[in-house]
Amino acid sequence: MASLDVLIVGLGSTHGLRAAEDELAGSLLRAGADAMLVRAERPREVRTLALTDLMWARAARRAAVESLAEAAPRAVVYSTTTAALLWPQPGAVRFDAPAAGNRPGRHGVWQRPVERRRLREAPLLVPQDAGALVEAGSPTTESVIVPIPVEPSDGGAGGVRDIAALTYATNPYKKGLDRVLAAWEAVRREDEELVVAGLRGPDRPGVRYAGTLDHDDYRALLRRARVYVTAPRREDYGIAQLEALADGTRVVTTPAPGPYAALPLLAGVGAEDGAPVGWVADPSPAALGAAVRAALDDATDDAVYADRALAAIAPFRRAAVDRTVAEELLPRLLRP
């Protein structure tokens, strides 16, 4: 049986999750660990969230069992609490948001109690933000916070900003697309266009739907946008907002329940100069629209804003995350 330092059991159920899993594996490898990432095989589509989670948890268990039969890892990391629900052996749990927060009522009827047990039994928790621990009930299990690394995309800031505003709305209700559209209608000027990524819909004056895009194409749109706007009803992390900052795009948002790691940064909480790098407003059309208008009309030079935004996301950059993985996470995973 082959030896291995760290086995990561991932779900890979979304592009964002796959990217986060790849980043964790890469960071462990750069820290000198012999790490391997395996992913669950996508199950068939089912109708309810509770059954969907069961199917994914079973798929993650199968992937873990098969890999454990071939290797003897010193540590196992389950990527998401769903991957850990039916684990074949205890391991660290990596998560952005717990079922306690994003599976209310009947949607999480079986997941929440099992999750509480797993978070107690795990040797280590690896949340992506401190807010995820709070939403999980502040478990006493030892934890290391490891953010998702965010970097400027190829091309970075500095290009032509020929799109007034961009939003991402694969899940329209959760992302608050109705709020964004109402605010946009209230403040847009004749020559300004809002591009809606991740969704098909009927174009109308001032609004264009870009549909589903691969990540490179999406980031290319982001580099062209002056403002990224979102009004989520719940935000598990806020990776799109961090990517916007990484590419020098001004960000307008609303407060939202959930860990929402990007929100304090956008509001200027903890900033050395106390200055926010985003515009945070109430979700009403008047308030959100005013924030969108203020961001669009912001007189700060684009290059100056891009430099400020990059400085603000320094804790989320790959170099910072690599230090946390090498100095804090890996020693805890591999200790006797």
Where are these regions (language model features)?
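A charged, aromatic-enriched C-terminal amphipathic alpha-helix characteristic of glycosyltransferases
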Residues: 54, 58, 283, 287, ...
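Carbohydrate-associated surface elements
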Residues: 131, 149
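Conserved donor-binding/catalytic core segment of Leloir-type glycosyltransferases
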Residues: 150, 156-175, 181-186, 194-195
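Aromatic "clamp/platform" in nucleotide-sugar-dependent glycosyltransferases that forms part
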Residues: 233
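Short hydrophobic beta-strand element within catalytic cores of glycosyltransferases
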Residues: 250-254, 260
